[in-house]
Amino acid sequence: MFQLIKITCFLKGFAYKGAIYMKKMMLFIIAVGATMISVFALGDAQQSYAHGYVDSPVSRVKNAEANGFGWGPGQDSSQPEIITTPQGIEAPTKLLDTGQLNGRLPSAGLASYSKLDEQTATRWVKSNITTGENNFKWVMTAKHKTNRFRYYMTKPGWNPNAPLTMDEMELIGIVGQPIGQDLPPGQGFMVNDTETHRIKIPADRKGYHVIYAVWDINDTINSF
């Protein structure tokens, strides 16, 4: 599952002018140093349901109610899967790796989640984190043998008012096999019901950023 996290970061050892304001912002995905971050995840397209999501820092889809989705007055219920199925964002890994999901990274190209692809500097609720090492917690609704988890983050100078693409992303962490070194099918490592990864946020990130978390499974052609 692909998980998108919106974060506000505060650099360790620095007094950031906007810190008081940003500390009042609610978690969206992850907060880093002086950076606001969003997180999203990609799931398994061969199943009728996907199998995992980033729970902390809270991902864009998991934080649906705070982001305006729901069944109540004034809330957006036009795409119910966003409200009921945070683990449902999924696509074949090759679509991500060949750039076919550019502009649709948060939804993984799924029409039923397309409103997650909206991208402006103010659209999404944000989480506060610091630069340096941070924990990322996944919740697995179904377990798979796994090749790796990988984490990307928007680069310094990215455009927060344009659709998200992998060209705007930098790889900041891998848990498991190096990219391009998949294990034979069925020989990946098994995950637990929850997985927590310690990922280092680069020291040069300030303001609003997005983190993109990907779970590359080993027993199908897909990623979450």
Regions found by a protein language model. Give the residues of each.
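Bacterial N-terminal signal peptides that target proteins for export
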Residues: Y21-I30
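Exposed beta-sheet edge/beta-hairpin loop segments within beta-rich domains
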Residues: K126-T131, F136, M140-A142, D182-G207
